[in-house]
Design a protein with these regions (language model features):
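Membrane-embedded hairpin module used as a gating/binding unit in multi-pass transport
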Residues: 33, 199-301, 305
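Juxtamembrane helix-boundary/capping and inter-helix hinge elements in multi-pass membrane proteins
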Residues: 43-46, 87-103, 139-140, 274-284, ...
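Membrane-embedded alpha-helical modules
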Residues: 104-210, 333-442
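Intrinsically disordered, low-complexity non-transmembrane regions of multi-pass membrane transporters
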Residues: 1-24, 211-239, 274-278, 431-453
């Protein structure tokens, strides 16, 4: 590939860029997912190194089961944090804060492992009935607003991170925009990596406290460490006496959460399909993507790592770089595995300024929403049709409103705004009269994704 065409044309085979460039692109994806992935264990009491190890292994397993066709990275899922905390809570302090017993995390991990198996059940249904019968319920008027909502619902975390230091965040944003718009050659397709490095260095230069924090974190970390905490694993749980009541409680608390994450998985695969211009819903198919996500979650949980999920951050990187080769994602997965054995490098990345993460995330989440807009426009959705307006309006308002006001609790099931919006959108599309979309005969734009099956 000529240097002048890099960043201006889609790249489906990154081998044309050369191995050094592929490694740098993989590093960019690793940095994009790192902030959110290490936050999950921090909030749930699990281990960061174990999380990174099984984010990498889970991603490679997903790619194996999806024939290496889907450029998705599997990071740690936020959807199960409430489940982990519910299982390990043993009381409350005088101020109302929870008292946690991390020895109970192995029970929670068992519950998540069973939740991962629920994906296999849905995967089997897709295989038996075929994607054609299922995907009629996911026309562009449903998938487009859902993809838009994915980016918008993630945006609050980006803004929160930016507030830590708006100057550093703005520097990150300007670097990303500058290189993506006016960069030449390789610089044009690694704007996120350059934004992270540039704003990181800027923060260290202008902020003595940040400089001291990074130095302390890196100097105290070891060069090598084993990334598995045995006491959090399900194997350790069954190596001794097991509280069957606690085991059932963990399963009943956590497994229902998989209903929401499976709906979100479908939205994520639609987003990746729209970004790359390929119909991954048909080839390799939802039955394979669900199987890969579910087994990755079960495997991670057995060893005491958080549940895995397809990551929106990396979808944003795909949209920005226009390099869609899954090989690059697999390189990122291998880097994550290596980093999990090196606490010093993990500490260096973990010490990344919060505002830096916020700045690059703001761009990435915006790119996801822009992909949703493109999906609607290129599939020529008619917004003079009241039916379409109602469906899109409710998906967007429910997703954003519930996200900012708190999830809906139905018994032990906690439904996120995106899950509720997806369910409502699917139901309205199935129930409301006046469909103007025929699944097998979609009138698409010249550059739209062919969603026909």
């Amino acid at each position: 590939m000529s240097k002048s065409s890099i960043g201006t044309e889609p790249v489906y085979d990154a081998r044309t860029l050369g191995k050094p460039r592929m490694f740098i692109l993989g590093l960019q994806h690793m940095f994009a997912m790192f902030g959110a992935t290490v936050l999950v264990p921090a909030l749930s009491g699990l281990d960061v190194a174990t999380t990174l190890l099984f984010a990498g292994i889970g991603t490679l397993l997903f790619h194996l089961l999806t024939k290496g066709k889907v450029p998705a990275f599997l990071g740690s899922s936020f959807a199960f944090i409430g489940g982990y905390n519910a299982v390990r809570t043993i009381g409350t302090n005088a101020d109302g804060s929870a008292i946690y017993n991390n020895d109970l995390l192995a029970y929670a991990c068992f519950g998540v492992a069973i939740a991962g198996l629920m994906y296999i059940i849905l995967s089997t249904l897709f295989k038996i009935f075929g994607v054609k019968k299922v995907m009629r319920y996911f026309p562009p008027i449903v998938t487009g607003p859902i993809i838009i909502a994915i980016g918008l619902t993630l945006s609050s975390s980006a803004i929160t991170n930016c507030r830590a230091n708006w100057l550093i965040a703005i520097v990150a944003i300007l670097i990303v925009i500058g290189f993506n718009m006016w960069g030449k050659g390789m610089a044009k397709i690694i704007p996120i990596l350059l934004g992270v490095l540039g704003s990181y260095i800027f923060a260290i230069i202008i902020d003595p406290a940040e400089r001291a924090s990074v130095a302390a974190a890196v100097s105290s970390a070891k060069w090598f460490g084993l990334p598995i905490v045995w006491k959090n694993s399900v194997f350790h749980l069954f190596a001794g006496p097991v509280d069957s009541g606690m085991l059932w409680s963990a399963v009943l608390t956590i497994v229902p959460l998989s209903l929401a994450t499976m709906v979100e998985h479908i939205g994520d695969i639609c987003a990746i399909s729209s970004t790359c211009g390929k119909n991954f819903m048909v080839d390799p198919g939802f039955h394979r993507t669900l199987l890969g996500d579910g087994l990755a979650t079960t495997l991670a949980s057995l060893f005491g790592a958080p549940a895995n999920t397809t990551y929106g951050e990396n979808t944003g990187v795909l949209a920005l770089s226009r390099v869609y080769d899954p090989r690059v994602i697999r390189i990122a997965a291998c880097i994550a595995i290596v980093v999990s054995f090196c606490p010093k490098f993990a500490a260096l990345v973990s010490a990344m300024p919060t505002a830096t993460i916020g700045g690059v995330s703001l761009v990435l989440y915006g790119m996801i929403s822009a992909v949703g807009v493109r999906n609607v426009v290129e599939n020529k959705v008619d917004f003079t049709n009241t039916r379409n307006v109602i469906i899109a309006a409710l998906i967007l308002v429910l997703a954003i409103g519930i996200t900012y006001s708190g999830s809906i609790q139905i018994g032990v099931v906690s439904l996120s705004g995106l899950a509720v919006a997806s369910i409502v959108g699917i139901l309205l599309n199935a129930i409301l009269p006046g469909k103007d979309y025929t699944f097998e005969q979609n009138d698409q734009g010249a550059t739209s994704v062919d969603f026909k099956v």
